[in-house]
Amino acid sequence: MTTAKTAISALVVMGVSGCGKSVVGAEIALNSGGRLIEGDVFHPAANIEKMSAGIPLTDEDRAGWLTRLGEEVASALENGERPILTCSSLKLRYRERLREAVPGLGFVFLELSKEVATDRCAHRPGHFMPASLVDSQFAALEPPHGEPRTLVVDATQSVDTIGKQAAAWWEESRVG
């Protein structure tokens, strides 16, 4: 766990496919009064088609998507909201791109093993991301250990526990 040195403006719930970004993001929103922004909704159709076909996205595929996510979070902040974005943010350069768009951005990294992620993806109904892409996600992952405004949590804990922990960490950054 890393403590926040300065106030966190918004959160990104990050990690590989199957780590629980959507359910944890919703729980953090519930515990913090924030607004969940589901990053997958902003993928262009071509990205969804590639992932559905088991083809990993390239940095180029993600570029416009990351720009759009940064704009959405910045807009939410301008409207006085407390945004919580779900986004894999696997590489440092992706996180830096989001940080450039949103000053004070914090990250909650849902850390888990490849085996657990694969099992979760294999048993997740109705999602476009196949379990076959988990290996490529771990290959691309640059864990954010030691990065500023980053909370690392064990993603095998209960959603309730993670949501409360992350919301408290966020609030603590705001009050000093």
PLM region spans:
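Hydrophobic anchor at the beta1->P-loop junction of P-loop NTPases
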Residues: 13
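The conserved Walker
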Residues: 17
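Conserved substrate/cofactor phosphate-moiety recognition/catalytic segment
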Residues: 26-71
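Glycine-rich phosphate-binding loop used to anchor ATP phosphates in small-molecule kinases
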Residues: 60-102, 110
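Small-molecule kinase domains that catalyze NTP-dependent phosphoryl transfer to phosphate-bearing small molecules
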Residues: 123-165
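Conserved phosphate-donor/acceptor-positioning beta-strand/loop module used by diverse small-molecule
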Residues: 102-121, 153
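Conserved lysine of the Walker
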Residues: 21
